[in-house]
Amino acid sequence: MVTIFTNFVRYNKIIHSLPFKLILVIIVALIFGNFIPEVLKAFLLSVSLSIKSLLLFILPLIIFSFAFCSFAQLSNGLLTFTLLLLSMMCVSNFIAVLCSYYAAIISQSIIAVIIDTNSTHAISLEPLFELNLPRLCDNTVGLVLGIALGLYTSIKKLLILKQIAKKFADTTNKFLNHIFIPILPLFILGFILKLQHTGALTILFKNFLPLLLVLISLHFLYIGCAYLIVMNFDIKRVIIAMRNIVPAAIVGFSTMSSAAALPILTISAVKNVKDHKLAQTIIPSIINTHMIGDALAIPLMAISLYIVKYQATPEFSVYLVFAISYVLAKFAAAGVPGGTIIVMIPVLESNLQFTPEMSGIILMMYILFDPFCTTANIFGNGLFPIVFEKIWCSLKKITKLS
């Protein structure tokens, strides 16, 4: 009886999980797409576009809330500590994004598919209506205001503003977890049906498995090499350090949420450093911002889609602007399923000429691959305090000597 109940709970969790729902949406579109009336497809596309418009309308507030909270909680107002932490997060994310660019180009022979325009319908699917909401302000404005107010709060040690920042971020997290994420399958459905209508979905679906294999390989190589370098190629230390992070990685894989793994990750990271308080301060500060898995995955997916769409590789100068924008936008991301890609869609659209359909595809791909990305994020965050401790201790010695 207990076994039956346990199996029921397990299967119930699977059925209600986001990846299962998204896979179901894709299967429904593939199998029943041709039987769905075109007017219904157009209506569902209109709903998807309207949800996107609503998201873009409130996105500056979402970005502001997470940036404000992230910077307000940093280092208890210690400016030097904060600047070092910010610099290391930016450099780490930037290096990962650049590596992903070259990895994407090298692996395109495995990933990329040339779209046969003769295999698609000549008639495109147009929405019945669109919800065109004005934007409150540019996303950059929300980001800059959040960073500025957060730093001011941290430096001045304003407890009331810290509490406000946390409540604001908690409210935003509730909106994402309880409103936006549950309607993600509906959000995706309209774009998927449009792809099915034009015949592009079948072509794209063939590409998922090779892309996933390349992505997992990239995560494994990058993070493995990072641990080896930091541990001076001491295999035993690498195994011990990574083994300590495994429990947090399992939680992250199953929940697709870095935030959900935060308590376990903090406990795990403490085992890998000498200064336990340092790790306990760093992990909550970087959990939503320093995401190596995302920094490798999103550019890889974005470049692959760009090549499929435009039959060309984005110029490095264009990609460099995207990389900088990516690093800045990461300060506004949430450690919830789909949190990063939500704030990255405007960056992709403005820097890499992403269309609404491409945005819908990468959102779907990101959610499907999110367990692997989150696992990589957690291993990356487990390594971060080790690197930070080395640099921070060296900096303190230099300061004392001078």
Predicted feature descriptions by range:
Residues 11-37, 49-58, 83-240, 398-402:
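Signature of multi-pass transmembrane helix bundles
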Residues 37-38, 70-80, 108-109, 153-159, ...:
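Juxtamembrane helix-boundary/capping and inter-helix hinge elements in multi-pass membrane proteins
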Residues 43, 79, 83, 201-209, ...:
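Membrane-water interface of transmembrane alpha-helices in multipass transporters/channels
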Residues 45-56, 163-178, 244-251, 267-271, ...:
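Short amphipathic alpha-helical coupling elements at transmembrane boundaries
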Residues 54, 90-94, 98, 216, ...:
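Hydrophobic transmembrane alpha-helical segments of multi-pass transport and channel proteins
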Residues 85-94, 172, 208-225, 244-252, ...:
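Small-residue-enriched core segments of transmembrane alpha-helices in multipass membrane transport
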Residues 112-113, 300-402:
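Transmembrane alpha-helical segments and their short flanking loops
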Residues 252-330, 395-402:
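Helix-loop-helix junctions within the multi-pass membrane cores of secondary transporters/permeases
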